[in-house]
């Protein structure tokens, strides 16, 4: 059996983790033997008083009132860790999501300080830039270029985007492009500030 992969995405109150923005949704989809399984992880999260920015509201269609009864990250952290532990996380613009998840782990006082201590990370944005230099490589543009269909992305959602990303990853690594993707798992997500990453998220 091949290594367990998890396509992963978050939605957040805004772009600036260093300014107190929080995760409001987590979505994850399991991939085994190059096929999506029915195993998924999805939850909305209460951002503990951090207001959702207008930009995030427009993108996600999530309002502050929608999250009043949602669990806190600390209440689901063990379930989340158990779902992803030991996997390779497939993330588009990984530095953004890794920064936010690590912040949530810190605030929850988790024993896991860095998600990369229990998972490896494959950044599809880095790979896409190698495959399609000089082109738009956000998830919308990339999935359209690779003819990923069957999804309504009028609004962003973490689980929806994780499903789209899983299909996109499988297409990217399907052998149709002459590129050694196994050697292109570039961990460059620390080179860009989250405030510069909006165009890569949309």
Identify the residue ranges that each predicted region occupies.
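Conserved non-catalytic scaffold segment of RNase H-like nuclease domains
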Residues: 1-118, 129, 141-145, 149-155
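Acidic, divalent-metal-coordinating active-site segment for phosphoryl/phosphodiester hydrolysis
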Residues: 157-169
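Mixed-charge, glycine-rich, non-catalytic linkers/tails in nucleic-acid processing enzymes
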Residues: 174-188
């Amino acid at each position: 059996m091949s290594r367990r992969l998890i396509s992963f995405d978050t939605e957040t109150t805004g772009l600036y983790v260093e300014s107190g923005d929080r995760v409001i949704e987590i979505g994850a989809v399991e991939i085994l033997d190059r096929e999506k399984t029915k195993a998924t992880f999805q939850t909305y999260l209460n951002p503990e008083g951090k207001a959702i920015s207008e930009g995030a509201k427009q993108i996600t269609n999530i309002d502050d009132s929608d999250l009043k009864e949602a669990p806190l990250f600390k209440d689901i952290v063990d379930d989340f860790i158990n779902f992803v532990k030991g996997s390779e996380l497939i993330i588009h613009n990984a530095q953004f999501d890794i920064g936010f998840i690590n912040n949530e782990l810190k605030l929850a006082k988790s024993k896991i300080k860095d998600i990369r201590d229990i998972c490896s990370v494959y950044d599809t944005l880095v790979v896409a830039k190698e495959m399609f230099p000089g082109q738009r490589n956000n998830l919308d543009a990339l999935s359209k270029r690779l003819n990923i269909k069957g999804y309504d992305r009028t609004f962003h959602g973490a689980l929806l985007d994780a499903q789209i990303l899983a299909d996109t990853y499988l297409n990217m690594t399907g052998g149709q492009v002459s590129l050694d993707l196994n050697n292109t798992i570039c961990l460059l997500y620390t080179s860009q500030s989250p405030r510069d990453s909006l165009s890569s998220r949309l």
